[in-house]
């Protein structure tokens, strides 16, 4: 969405649209401005992988709702089969973890595999969301940048690797 300058939530309804203090034409006008600023002709392509078929179906549905389904290739694939491609690459992942889908030991094994697969290479960046405070130690290197965030009600860290 960011590459194509598609505004988040452009196709959804907001409860604030019923507020009397904001004229309804303001919402319409801002949506028109946002749509006029979209860059549908950009060279954006993406790939989405998961080992869970249901997760892939949800991702496909969301991509369609966002209007980017034709630019994303989805496939069932394990992280163990991940390979770096040539050129620029950004990996963004929200892996399963102890509190969400996996037990702690399995999550730690996954982080180790990610550390082996996500090599420090020019033109490659990695962003990982997890609540695990020991992630960097298990992954094998310190993040270039960290941010606190919530994934729903779960306190997490956003670990960014780009150097």
Predicted regions and their residues:
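Conserved S-adenosyl-L-methionine
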Residues: 1-82, 99-100, 106
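Short coil/turn segments at beta-strand junctions that form active-site/ligand-binding loops
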Residues: 44, 70, 87-89, 124
């Amino acid at each position: 969405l960011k590459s194509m300058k598609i505004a988040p939530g452009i196709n959804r309804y907001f409860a604030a649209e019923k507020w009397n203090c904001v004229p309804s034409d303001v919402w319409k006008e801002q949506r028109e401005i946002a749509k006029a600023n979209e860059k549908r002709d950009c060279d954006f392509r993406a790939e989405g992988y998961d080992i869970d078929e249901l997760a892939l179906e949800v991702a496909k549905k969301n991509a369609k709702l966002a209007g980017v389904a034709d630019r994303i290739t989805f496939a069932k694939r394990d992280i163990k089969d991940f390979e770096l491609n040539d050129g620029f690459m950004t990996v963004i992942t929200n892996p399963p973890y102890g509190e969400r889908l996996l037990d702690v030991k399995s999550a730690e094994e996954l982080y180790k595999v990610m550390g082996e697969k996500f090599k420090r290479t020019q033109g490659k960046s990695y962003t990982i969301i997890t609540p695990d405070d020991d992630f960097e130690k298990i992954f094998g290197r310190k993040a270039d940048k960290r941010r606190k965030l919530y994934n729903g009600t779960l306190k997490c860290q956003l670990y960014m690797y780009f150097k």
